A protein has these predicted regions:
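Gly/Ser/Thr-rich phosphate-binding loop
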Residues: 1-55
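Structured core elements
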Residues: 13, 35-36, 48, 68-71, ...
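Conserved ATP/PPi-binding loop(s) of AMP-dependent carboxylate-activating enzymes
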Residues: 32, 59, 63-65, 72-98, ...
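Conserved C-terminal "lid"/linker of ANL adenylate-forming enzymes
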Residues: 155-158, 188-231
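Ser/Thr-glycine-rich phosphate-binding loops at phosphate-binding pockets of nucleotides
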Residues: 39-43, 106, 131, 213-215
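AMP-binding/adenylate-forming catalytic core of the ANL superfamily
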Residues: 71, 81, 87, 109-195
Length: 231
């Protein structure tokens, strides 16, 4: 494997989309150091980073010097520091949404562990709020589903039905399967989830792919609208 990468690569610095723990562990186990960080274009761009001798797999690292981070009541990551943009050029309305009370709202949900490492859980806009007040982060469920061979990709959303919000998994299958086979995957996944996270229904996505943005991210709003229009 080292030869494929030229034989001299021993350090990988990773940013952008979230790196799966499985991928990070793979490269660590073959002797390559993986340094994961987190930030936004609007933060020039770094907020947190792991170090070679101070890191945790699955985390985005610790807050870098000159930056302050805190979590809102929703656990959204808020940031301030000299590296933070003053705003969007000639777009005061977007700037007002981005920066409130001198804190930049990242739109990401995070948690700090006892050692100060930041773990990104998902996006605020994707969070599902159950009727009992419990927050469900679709990314936590999708990570488990997407490891199943039968599942090419999943998109978890919350559908309002009656007095509750139903956790629904839209599934792109890697091959044809019966509802019974799919339900086995759902049951297996649910065993790994907390009660409020459990998938309550699934829908097989019939098209070749989910609707995507220019950055290839699944457009959850469009997926939800499509499903709601058929129910």
């Amino acid at each position: 494997i080292h030869k494929v990468f030229g034989g001299k690569l021993n350090l990988i610095i990773c940013g952008g989309a979230a790196l799966s723990v499985q991928t990070e562990e793979f490269f660590e186990n073959i002797g390559m150091n993986v340094i994961n960080g987190y930030g936004l274009t609007e933060t020039s761009p770094l907020l947190t980073a792991n170090k070679i001798n101070d890191k945790k797999i699955g985390s985005a690292g610790k807050v870098i010097g000159g930056v302050e981070l805190k979590l809102s009541k929703q656990k959204e990551v808020l940031a301030r520091g000299k590296n933070i943009t003053p705003g969007y050029y000639k777009n005061p309305s977007a700037t007002k949404k981005l920066i409130q009370n001198n804190w930049l709202h990242t739109g990401d949900i995070g948690e700090f562990d006892e050692d100060g490492f930041l773990f990104i859980r998902g996006r605020v806009k994707n969070m599902i709020l159950k009727q009992n007040g419990m927050n469900v982060y679709p990314e936590d469920i999708e990570k488990i589903l997407d490891k199943e061979q039968l599942i090419k990709e999943s998109c978890v959303i919350g559908l309002n039905k009656g007095t509750d919000v139903i956790i629904t998994a839209a599934l792109l299958l890697s091959k044809k399967a019966s509802n019974k086979e799919i339900q086995k995957v759902i049951d297996k996944t649910n065993k790994k989830l907390e009660f409020h996270q459990k998938i309550q229904e699934f829908i097989v996505w019939k098209k070749k792919d989910f609707p995507r943005s220019f950055s290839f991210k699944v457009k959850k709003v469009d997926v939800q609208k499509t499903i709601e229009s058929k129910t």
